[in-house]
């Protein structure tokens, strides 16, 4: 979490909890017990809210990362909202289980469009369109789970940043 406080773009590819949207990370190698405890590998809302983020965009490439508890008058309160509360301007989430291969294709396209100067929403739109028009990923199950929450941001990349094939 300390490292996240100083970057403009955060990308987390991990597992998301179907019910809560909490994110399961690799356990910290410095855990104190013989077996990792839940706190060693689950990224909770309270962990995120305690951070002081300056990220313009957080990408949660995790199943169910748009999930949370629904509160009357508040809407969905989950990990994505915690990132916004901690200072992120925008969060890209998945609303349901995402296919690994389709997500890889989506993310490559998404980052390429961001690098070309498109806004996050335009990059999402173009990436969804590309999947939708493909033979392999034309079903909505593959291209429709991604949702942007927050501001429609642009990301400035360094000249030597590259989207790997």
Task: Map each language-model feature to its residues.
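Catalytic cores of enzymes
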Residues: 1-165
